């Protein structure tokens, strides 16, 4: 019973987990944060940058192909959201712009991101569906469990793909090694026969 209660508490803690970072951005530089995200997942975030007169910070969210999912210029404090189309690595970049005549100052950037189950407002769902607090918690745990199962399925699929790739690579390496050995044996045989004919022509051997 105690173990079951511990697992429930752990799942509830995971359900409320989010990713928060704070970093310093030097003048006229950019810093990008990357993360692998599953397909059809909602990503939400909040950002805040320290204000320095005359300095500008832009942000952009994009995929590995360069498709822009969210973008805003001259940011100070705000929110953003986008939906991932396919499973791949997505990045959020913050870009500092300082005029040439101005001496740049390092700025602080804070970012809080949520994705998937973390983006749902279970309090609002509970009020709309007239659910009891315990039912809301169970709904949250159900969604979290489904998310964990999907993550494991995806990890298993990627493991199988990597294993298939390794097996194909090993097969190709083995084939290439056998082919190389056959070529070397053929070349050595040809050299022996050629030298034998040459020495016979010179009457150095019978």
Swiss-Prot record:
Location relative to the cell: Membrane
BP-aspect Gene Ontology terms: dorsal/ventral pattern formation; endoplasmic reticulum to Golgi vesicle-mediated transport
Cytoplasmic side: 194-206
GO molecular function: cargo receptor activity
Lineage top rank: taxon: Eukaryota
Record-annotated membrane-spanning stretches: 173-193
Stretches assigned to the Lumenal side: 21-172
GO cellular component: cytoplasm; membrane
Keyword Signal: yes
Signal peptide positions on this chain: 1-20
UniProt keyword list: Developmental protein, Membrane, Signal, Transmembrane, Transmembrane helix
Stored PANTHER family: TRANSMEMBRANE EMP24 DOMAIN-CONTAINING PROTEIN (PTHR22811)
Family per similarity comment: Belongs to the EMP24/GP25L family.
Protein name: Transmembrane emp24 domain-containing protein bai
UniProt organism field: Drosophila simulans
Organismal lineage: Eukaryota, Metazoa, Ecdysozoa, Arthropoda, Hexapoda
């Amino acid at each position: 019973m105690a173990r079951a209660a511990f697992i429930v508490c752990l799942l509830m803690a995971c359900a409320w987990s989010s990713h928060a970072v704070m970093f310093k951005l030097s003048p006229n530089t950019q810093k990008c944060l990357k993360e692998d995200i599953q397909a059809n997942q909602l990503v939400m975030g909040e950002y805040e940058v320290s204000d320095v007169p005359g300095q500008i910070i832009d942000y952009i969210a994009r995929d590995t192909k360069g498709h822009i999912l969210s973008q805003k210029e001259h940011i100070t404090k705000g929110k953003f959201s986008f939906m991932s189309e396919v499973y791949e690595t997505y990045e959020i970049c913050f870009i500092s712009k300082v005029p040439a005549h101005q001496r740049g100052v390092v700025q602080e950037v804070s970012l809080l991101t949520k994705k998937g189950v973390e983006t749902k407002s279970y309090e609002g769902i509970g009020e709309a569906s007239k659910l009891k607090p315990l039912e809301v918690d169970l709904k949250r745990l159900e969604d979290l469990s489904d998310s964990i199962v999907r993550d494991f399925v995806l990890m298993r699929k990627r493991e199988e793909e990597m294993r298939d790739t390794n097996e194909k690579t090993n097969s190709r390496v083995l084939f290439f090694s056998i082919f190389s050995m056959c070529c070397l044996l053929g070349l050595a045989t040809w050299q022996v026969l050629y030298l034998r004919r040459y020495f016979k022509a010179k009457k150095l051997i019978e």
